[in-house]
Swiss-Prot record:
Gene: PA
Complex formation: Influenza RNA polymerase is composed of three subunits: PB1, PB2 and PA. Interacts (via C-terminus) with PB1 (via N-terminus).
Protein's recorded name: Polymerase acidic protein
Any Gene Ontology CC annotation: host cell nucleus
Gene3D superfamilies: Influenza RNA-dependent RNA polymerase subunit PA, endonuclease domain
Amino acid sequence: MEDFVRQCFNPMIVELAEKAMKEYGEDLKIETNKFAAICTHLEVCFMYSDFHFINEQGESIVVELDDPNALLKHRFEIIEGRDRTMAWTVVNSICNTTGAEKPKFLPDLYDYKENRFIEIGVTRREVHIYYLEKANKIKSENTHIHIFSFTGEEMATKADYTLDEESRARIKTRLFTIRQEMANRGLWDSFRQSERGEETIEEKFEISGTMRRLADQSLPPNFSCLENFRAYVDGFEPNGCIEGKLSQMSKEVNAKIEPFLKTTPRPIKLPNGPPCYQRSKFLLMDALKLSIEDPSHEGEGIPLYDAIKCIRTFFGWKEPYIVKPHEKGINSNYLLSWKQVLAELQDIETEEKIPRTKNMKKTSQLKWALGENMAPEKVDFDNCRDISDLKQYDSDEPELRSLSSWIQNEFNKACELTDSIWIELDEIGEDVAPIEYIASMRRNYFTAEVSHCRATEYIMKGVYINTALLNASCAAMDDFQLIPMISKCRTKEGRRKTNLYGFIIKGRSHLRNDTDVVNFVSMEFSLTDPRLEPHKWEKYCVLEIGDMLLRSAIGQMSRPMFLYVRTNGTSKIKMKWGMEMRRCLLQSLQQIESMIEAESSVKEKDMTKEFFENKSEAWPIGESPKGVEEGSIGKVCRTLLAKSVFNSLYASPQLEGFSAESRKLLLVVQALRDNLEPGTFDLGGLYEAIEECLINDPWVLLNASWFNSFLTHALK
């Protein structure tokens, strides 16, 4: 491309482009497409000005041959191509002599006939898209915009094209020639795509057939076809009175647009009340694993066999007792349920052959814990038609809960590294195309950053538990099946490891609809004393079941081992999504990929390697009361993954609503930061919609608190 530019353009233009790139610290050897774009833009600016003069009568004339007798003044002052200091000097001088308003950005030309600055654009995309980008950036009614494309299209402010047709045709022909020359050398595709930094398949996307008819049918009133509507939108003056424009569009609209300033937004109000409680389906940072390394026992891989093998590694069992009761439950039933599990596991061990699955005896404590016979009787609606006061039973409003520090601790823990590897590198065969090579490289770098992450452990744990529970719900509908909570990983040395977190006992599960609920009792090992944060464990009955010897720097120490027991429930659709938690890896990888793409687009080459290997660079991770938190690229990967995993673990209607509504406020704040002068109407209604979602969910409350930190720092 560099050779082509030096052959194709006048040496003076090439020299000016080199200077411009040097001034902005850009390397023309690397950013060759940018080099070509600057040369093209300079040439169009010079061609725009060439041969245009103002005669003694003040008329604009075109003179192609030098006539030394004519007293002619150049019609256009060329600003583009000068160094910044000189360019601003020229602009200031013009403003002082003509009284023109000083522009915010350096324009390309000044037209002495029309007394206006001109911004010239040369685009490889649709002219109207580029025009809108320019208009949004400049935000000035005094600077005239004129856009040319390589396909012969053009667009100008108020369709005022300034020059005569022949002069414009000369510019279009030159652009078309540059395009042809590039295409002949195989440079055009790369040049065209580099403007937006992503691949586009069609140069011009024409709508035809059914889609075209639908487009014409779905236009607002008073527009006969899509072209008319496009022209109206392109000519829409954004600085006009928006209220007036709105009322033109529809008689029903009556909106008062208020300017959105730095002082406009207020913090989101978080609810007051007792602290929020843990509501995930399994323990996260508080979970304890009983593990076996290099499992090679008989029946290895069969969950019940693995569980019994893990249970045998622990010798500190003791008579269980309740240390933190569940306030509303019959706690003795939870205690009896655990004793029953231990007893039935011991019974299995005395059998000659361990069964593949274990169904628990339907004791009174398990029937109570699993809500057996507690569901109200269903009656066919036709049999109730004659009952005059038939109504849905009243349900209490949920109690408001306040944010508690434990959920931030949970999130921080999810971002940390463990000493185990939770996902393997998938081998997908040899790469064929270059894009596959880049994709594999990105996947491998990303996997290396997150394979040890605790959030990845939660993914594998969630996938296992949900898969096992859904299988059991379908295969043993009437049974109280015992399901071990298991995960598998590798140690740093590469040895296989099987972990047992505890057990689930499933209730009756005749799941016809996606939302039908299956009840289960979870019993999970932990070293966390529930009395330290009793509000977190509101839904749990916690037993002390043993003492565990732990090795530390100062020798061995004994810690009490707890069992967190609770009744819970889930549905087919929730289990289906739980089984697909690996998608969180994909979502966070795509977010990282878009960061790499943005970087690659600026540098005009793939930046994957530099992105992951430049360990010194700090990236923004998130907002906290202290300000913008920064960290390594690995930390960014793990934080994005943890957010995605928590969205899955704490999925709820409150989260859906908060995400959708707070996003609107976020976009307005970002527009303000980008100096786009946003306006809003019914901002109070938006706040109401956001705050309506803040009820009792810990993850939503934490996100709202983060959002407030963002508002504080974004509007400083």
